[in-house]
A protein has these predicted regions:
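C-terminal structural segment of proteins
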Residues: 1-174
Length: 174
């Protein structure tokens, strides 16, 4: 759910004895850095009281794809949440978040902005996938995830355009 909430620009409402604050969901989780034991930006004594989803045009063209090892039905090798807002056949706004590739849901705003005003077609989604994963470095045991993520991004963007492709047993067009 974290990947989808990040893609949809959710806002986390936090309460503490000192008062309340709001944090964009994409900023709620942290990269390990010097404190790998802390995976979020909650401070001591704080409590999540609500999570809001802003009204956007993503309700029609949205998809979530989770790729996982057959032996493990819980943790994703790669997951992708995509929201597209179309107007006159062109992409007005795009949101793409990856899971399973970083310590937190991964978004690249420049890649989302690249899609604005473009046709929703495979070539544009492939270029976006390249932008999202530019500079990605894998290790011996997970290097395959980079190419897997690129393919998953393109597939999920195409799935978002066709909600019927998400029915159980449906075969995506890609």
């Amino acid at each position: 759910m974290c990947v989808a909430l990040s893609a949809l620009d959710a806002v986390v409402h936090i309460s503490a004895p000192e008062g309340e604050r709001n944090v964009a969901f994409s900023d709620f989780h942290r990269l390990p850095g010097a404190t790998p034991e802390s995976d979020n930006n909650l401070k001591k004594g704080e409590l999540i009281t609500a999570i809001d989803l802003p009204e956007k045009g993503f309700s029609k063209y949205y998809s979530y794809l989770k790729l996982r090892d057959r032996a493990s039905y819980s943790f994703a090798l790669v997951s992708v949440a995509t929201g597209l807002d179309l107007e006159n056949g062109l992409i007005k706004e795009a949101r793409i978040a990856l899971g399973g590739v970083s310590h937190k849901p991964w978004r690249v705003k420049e890649a989302e902005d690249f899609l604005k005003g473009k046709e929703p077609k495979i070539a544009n989604f492939e270029a976006t996938a390249q932008m999202i994963l530019k500079g990605a470095k894998g290790f011996e045991h997970n290097r395959f995830k980079i190419e897997l993520a690129k393919k998953a991004i393109v597939r999920n963007c195409m799935m978002a355009l066709d909600p019927t492709s998400q029915r159980p047993g449906a075969k995506p067009s890609l």
